[in-house]
Amino acid sequence: MKTTIKQAKDHLNQDVTIGAWLTNKRSSGKIAFLQLRDGTGFMQGVVVKSEVDEEVFKLAKEIAQESSLYVTGTITEDNRSDLGYEMQVKSIEVISEAHDYPITPKNHGTEFLMDHRHLWLRSKKQHAVMKIRNEVIRATYEFFNKDGFTKVDPPILTASAPEGTSELFHTKYFDQDAFLSQSGQLYLEAAAMAHGKVFSFGPTFRAEKSKTRRHLIEFWMIEGEMAFTNHAESLEIQEQYVTHVVKSVLENCKLELKILERDTSKLEKVATPFPRISYDDAIEFLKAEGFDDIEWGEDFGAPHETAIANHYDLPVFITNYPTKIKPFYMQPNPENEETVLCADLIAPEGYGEIIGGSERVDDLELLEQRVKEHGLDEEAYSYYLDLRRYGSVPHCGFGLGLERTVAWISGVEHVRETAPFPRLLNRLYP
């Protein structure tokens, strides 16, 4: 009977065949231990010399790392294993033998591993990170579908930038200029006027020359837009979403979190409502903590965000930033018109901002004024202005960076490990 490593638990004391790769092996004179993986998990195969043909034991000792095999044997309980079971191997069939696999069981430098990212993905820890990434995506669809959101796919090639920045990748679109999308927000706002609540999940591109452990040039973003929604209601949706994702990973990725040696007690504390601190109060807090490199009207850097998040040891919303450091489309704060109705959600443990969101300007005259103040081409944003001409309503939205969120939940040090093939400032291969 052919099965997988994950399903093998359903076949205790039965003979099964598993297609797998050999990740590692060790042997003594009379027994060989094969570390097997098949994409669904990792399992040990035990080959006892006295219980198999001589050629099977010889093969078990000699087969090279990452060779592909069909391994047949009996599934038995093993309480020492993370899985709780192993295979007593009876026969081995080589599908394809590997030669001189470059990532041996010794330590390798980061650049070497990134050069061999196509192979590094096979390692136990990298496999665990990708499984957690997959669970975050699965839980995302579950949350939005259950809450009545419609998925909309905004274009990747755009004629204008939602953020109004210069950090864009430019390309030619026949005889026109086009840019790789930094965000699907403006298109999602249009879709929200048709469907009420919408979300998207797709790649975004930032031509930022950043080399920090938090930044990727290409990353995936989950964005939501909601009509007839105010800022306070939006924050509630955001914290419910993040809490749902964290709980889903805790429930469905126990083994992966164990492999990564993640301190899950920090994740278990994540619950609604999240702490909130205004930008004004955050500045005062930082001053009291001895930070003299930040003044009102300036954006926070990584050390500032870390200090604020560590104070709460939970995800924390920083609300109502100064108007001048935020994009043109954010709604003024009625209690202080020098600030806007926005929030960044900062993850604890130094992982930084994972969500940025705001209430959107819904008044046509104000939005036209903002477009001019930011030096933007009004014609390029005419479709966006139309949304305020024809039945404008209060509405809000937010965007969550997938890779940064996965880094926080999985506890990996650098965001590059959370993308299958990360694009960094100096890396376009593989």
UniProtKB/Swiss-Prot annotation:
<keyword id="KW-0547">Nucleotide-binding</keyword>
<protein>
    <recommendedName>
        <fullName>Asparagine--tRNA ligase</fullName>
        <ecNumber>6.1.1.22</ecNumber>
    </recommendedName>
</protein>
<dbReference type="GO" id="GO:0005524">
    <property type="term" value="F:ATP binding"/>
</dbReference>
<dbReference type="Pfam" id="PF00152">
    <property type="entry name" value="tRNA-synt_2"/>
</dbReference>
<dbReference type="GO" id="GO:0004816">
    <property type="term" value="F:asparagine-tRNA ligase activity"/>
</dbReference>
<dbReference type="InterPro" id="IPR006195">
    <property type="entry name" value="aa-tRNA-synth_II"/>
</dbReference>
<dbReference type="GO" id="GO:0006421">
    <property type="term" value="P:asparaginyl-tRNA aminoacylation"/>
</dbReference>
<dbReference type="InterPro" id="IPR002312">
    <property type="entry name" value="Asp/Asn-tRNA-synth_IIb"/>
</dbReference>
<dbReference type="GO" id="GO:0016740">
    <property type="term" value="F:transferase activity"/>
</dbReference>
<comment type="subunit">
    <text>Homodimer.</text>
</comment>
<keyword id="KW-0963">Cytoplasm</keyword>
<dbReference type="InterPro" id="IPR004522">
    <property type="entry name" value="Asn-tRNA-ligase"/>
</dbReference>
<dbReference type="InterPro" id="IPR004364">
    <property type="entry name" value="Aa-tRNA-synt_II"/>
</dbReference>
<dbReference type="GO" id="GO:0003676">
    <property type="term" value="F:nucleic acid binding"/>
</dbReference>
<dbReference type="Pfam" id="PF01336">
    <property type="entry name" value="tRNA_anti-codon"/>
</dbReference>
<dbReference type="InterPro" id="IPR004365">
    <property type="entry name" value="NA-bd_OB_tRNA"/>
</dbReference>
<comment type="similarity">
    <text>Belongs to the class-II aminoacyl-tRNA synthetase family.</text>
</comment>
<dbReference type="InterPro" id="IPR012340">
    <property type="entry name" value="NA-bd_OB-fold"/>
</dbReference>
<dbReference type="InterPro" id="IPR045864">
    <property type="entry name" value="aa-tRNA-synth_II/BPL/LPL"/>
</dbReference>
<dbReference type="GO" id="GO:0005737">
    <property type="term" value="C:cytoplasm"/>
</dbReference>
<dbReference type="GO" id="GO:0140096">
    <property type="term" value="F:catalytic activity, acting on a protein"/>
</dbReference>
<keyword id="KW-0067">ATP-binding</keyword>
<keyword id="KW-0648">Protein biosynthesis</keyword>
<keyword id="KW-0436">Ligase</keyword>
<keyword id="KW-0030">Aminoacyl-tRNA synthetase</keyword>
